[in-house]
C-alpha cells in the first residue's frame, strides 16, 4: 500500500468524495477523501490530512477507520467544533459515525452505526434547531437513486425511520452534498 509521500507517483490511486474544511482551532484546512489504491476497490480507507497555505501536507489517517472499511464519506462539524466522520461501511450496507480528534485528522471513537442494512452512500448531516438530519443516496454506483433522510437529537442515540425526499431518482441524478448559504440549506446532486 502507498505511503503519503508516494501518492503522487501512483496514477491509479483513487481519491473520491474530496472535501475541505477549515479547522479554526488549528488554523489548518482538513482534506477528507475515500482512498483506494491501484488494486481497485479493496483498500476501503479514509484519507484525512491537514495543510496551511504554503505549508506541508500532514497526513493524519490513511487507513480503515478503527479497523472498519470506509467508502463514501464526509465530515460534519457540530456547534461545539467537534468533528465527525460519516462513512459508508460493511461494503456500503451501513453508515458509521466516528468522532475525530481535535485536529480532525484521526478517528477516536465509533459513535453510532445507522441505516443498518439499507445500503446508503454519500452521507451528509446538518443540524437545525437542535435536531440532526442525515441525508444519503442509495448505493447504486453512479446511477440515479432516491435521496432519503433520518433524524435524531443525539448522534449516539436512536434515529427516526428513514424517509424519502424528492422524487424516486433525485431528478435523474444522485444526492451528493448539502451546502449552507446564510440560513438556507441546499442539496447538491
List the predicted regions and their residue ranges.
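Carbohydrate-active catalytic/glycan-binding domains of CAZyme proteins
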Residues: 1-189
Amino acid at each position: 500500500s502507498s505511503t503519503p509521500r508516494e501518492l503522487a507517483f501512483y496514477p491509479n490511486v483513487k481519491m473520491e468524495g474530496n472535501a475541505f474544511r477549515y479547522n479554526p482551532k488549528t488554523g489548518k484546512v482538513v482534506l477528507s477523501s475515500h482512498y483506494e489504491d491501484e488494486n481497485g476497490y479493496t483498500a476501503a480507507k479514509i484519507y484525512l490530512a491537514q495543510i496551511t497555505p504554503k505549508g506541508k501536507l500532514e497526513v493524519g489517517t490513511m487507513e480503515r477507520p478503527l479497523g472498519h472499511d470506509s467508502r463514501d464519506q464526509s465530515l460534519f462539524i457540530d456547534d461545539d467544533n467537534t468533528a465527525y466522520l460519516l462513512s459508508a461501511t460493511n461494503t456500503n450496507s451501513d453508515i458509521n459515525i466516528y468522532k475525530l480528534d481535535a485536529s480532525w485528522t484521526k478517528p477516536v471513537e465509533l459513535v453510532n452505526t445507522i441505516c443498518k442494512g439499507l445500503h446508503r452512500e454519500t452521507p451528509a448531516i446538518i443540524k437545525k434547531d437542535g435536531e440532526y438530519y442525515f441525508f444519503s443516496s442509495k448505493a447504486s454506483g453512479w446511477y440515479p437513486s432516491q435521496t432519503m433522510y433520518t433524524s435524531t437529537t443525539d448522534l449516539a442515540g436512536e434515529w427516526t425511520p428513514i424517509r424519502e425526499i424528492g422524487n424516486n431518482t433525485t431528478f435523474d441524478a444522485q444526492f451528493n452534498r448539502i451546502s449552507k448559504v446564510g440560513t438556507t440549506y441546499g442539496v447538491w446532486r
